[in-house]
Amino acid sequence: WGFQGAVASQFHEIAFAVPLLAWASAAFVEGRWVAVMAWSAPLVLVKEDLGLTVMMIGLVLAWRGRENEKSFTYPLFFAVFGLLAFFVTVKLLLPAFNASGTWAYSLDGSSNRGDVTLIERALWPAQKYGVIAMVILGAGIIGMASPWFWVIMPTIAWRFLGSVDYYWDWKHWHYNAILIPILLGALLDVHRRWSSQEDSSISRGWGWVTSTQRPLVATIALAL
């Protein structure tokens, strides 16, 4: 669904982000943390908000590798890199190229939305719930159990806090395309962990429990 909207829309720079996120997602599922960071780092050159996505990837890797000092520390530095790249881009680079000296797409909450709270901006109008439903289904529901699922949060946050109606839609435009490889990566990550649990459960006579879950995962993924 995310790719269909992007294909029907105009060309956008997110076309460069999709394969990078796909390779990063595959590396995460395989447990190759250095490869995840290598594929994710160029995202800061694609679009201004993706520095926040890089930051979240670093935090997710730190969480997954928290039992090892190096696997915990290096991803934290990577998260800081993503955050710094975001601020340098939106506070220095983009204003320098703008005649008015500002970041034209800042989330100022304008467009006649009145005096509303941050929570109201994030959760209203109800059109946003369609996006929430689709990302949950896009991860096969069970993908929400993967820390990789949290990589979508910066994108969801700026879209929901933004004042442009197109940001809140799941059917059209290109804004959902970068979510797809992340959601599939989250789904595959949970499936891989289930498979590992099944291998250990077979020896204890409980393999039938996890084996019954595979058809459900496959059905949800194929339907989407």
Question: What residue ranges belong to the model's regions?
Answer:
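Aromatic- and kink-enriched transmembrane "portal" helix at the membrane-lumen/periplasm boundary
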Residues: 1-15, 45-50, 160
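Specific aromatic-rich, kink-prone transmembrane helix
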Residues: 14-40, 58, 62-64, 182
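Transmembrane helices and adjacent periplasmic/lumenal helix-loop junctions
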Residues: 33-61, 145-149
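Perimembrane helix-loop-helix junctions
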Residues: 53-82
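Signature aromatic-anchored transmembrane alpha helix within multi-pass, membrane-resident enzymes
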Residues: 79-83, 195-224
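Extracytoplasmic catalytic-loop and juxtamembrane helix elements of membrane-embedded
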Residues: 90-120, 157-176
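Hydrophobic, aromatic-rich transmembrane alpha-helices
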Residues: 128-156
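Hydrophobic/aromatic-rich transmembrane helices and adjacent perimembrane loops
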Residues: 150-205
